[in-house]
Amino acid sequence: MTAPIPVVVAGALGRMGAEVIKAVVGAEDCSLVGAIDNTPGKEGADVGLELGLGELEVAVTADFEGCLCAVSQSVRDSGSGAVLVDFTHPSVVYEHTRAAIAYGVHPVIGTTGLSPEQLNDLTEFSAKASVGGAVIPNFSVGMVLLQQAAAAAARFYDHAELTELHHNRKADAPSGTCIKTAELMEELGKSFNPEEVDEHESLAGCRGGQRDSGLRLHSVRLPGLVAHQEVMFGAPGETYTLRHDTIDRSAYMPGVLLTVRKVGNLGSLVYGLERLI
């Protein structure tokens, strides 16, 4: 019988981290071996008790590198490869990903905010270290289908705008998912939204951010939202709208577990769930 995949979760007490831990604990082929979180007063607490899952005998720690070092040594002795699932903050995600690779732990990064330059650097670093990893802007299979549909529709429409809507505690804008959708639409190499009038904004930024391709991206942040995205295409006499709504974070868990199971077979860092399905 194959040994379960050792999994460390960073951001363990956050909303996404908690969902990941529930999914990992419920998966027969995975084993929770680390829980990293810097919430004050939680150091040393049993993460299972904190999340209402019962005792899991995995203590919460704020020592990111210390945890990775210990797990790396443990799996090296056992011959299996560990995985880090990171849902933390854009300000630390680059350092977290690089540290995981350095310790030989496969990073599965759900935290958005990495720049193209940082992604390139991490991809090169992971390839040199022969440590597979994945940066996934959105773990929803439904969102991958929307992105593929948007890329196909972009062949036929010259006018398009993207709107992403998230809860008001999301730090980065636009979302990594929205940027990824735009990038897929731009692979055709065409320009969008040719100017037909001399526009003037009476309120700066009200028309959204515009990429070099001409695509416009809009961000909405409100309490009550989870994660939502709309791509609207326009042509004379018609509009075509694609929309995906995440109602509950449990929707991401099949994609998270899929990535955890596949990342150990990769030779370097990949970007996007579509690379794995």
Curated annotation (Swiss-Prot):
GO terms for biological process: diaminopimelate biosynthetic process; lysine biosynthetic process via diaminopimelate. Its EC number is 1.17.1.8. GO terms for molecular function: 4-hydroxy-tetrahydrodipicolinate reductase; NAD binding; NADP binding; oxidoreductase activity, acting on CH or CH2 groups, NAD or NADP as acceptor. PROSITE patterns: DAPB. Gene3D superfamilies: Dihydrodipicolinate Reductase, domain 2, NAD(P)-binding Rossmann-like Domain. It catalyses: (S)-2,3,4,5-tetrahydrodipicolinate + NAD(+) + H2O = (2S,4S)-4-hydroxy-2,3,4,5-tetrahydrodipicolinate + NADH + H(+); (S)-2,3,4,5-tetrahydrodipicolinate + NADP(+) + H2O = (2S,4S)-4-hydroxy-2,3,4,5-tetrahydrodipicolinate + NADPH + H(+). SUPFAM superfamilies: Glyceraldehyde-3-phosphate dehydrogenase-like, C-terminal domain, NAD(P)-binding Rossmann-fold domains. Pfam families: DapB_C, DapB_N. The active site is at 166 (proton donor/acceptor), 170 (proton donor). Pathway: Amino-acid biosynthesis; L-lysine biosynthesis via DAP pathway; (S)-tetrahydrodipicolinate from L-aspartate: step 4/4. It is found in: Cytoplasm. The keyword NADP applies. Belongs to the DapB family. Catalyzes the conversion of 4-hydroxy-tetrahydrodipicolinate (HTPA) to tetrahydrodipicolinate. This is 4-hydroxy-tetrahydrodipicolinate reductase.
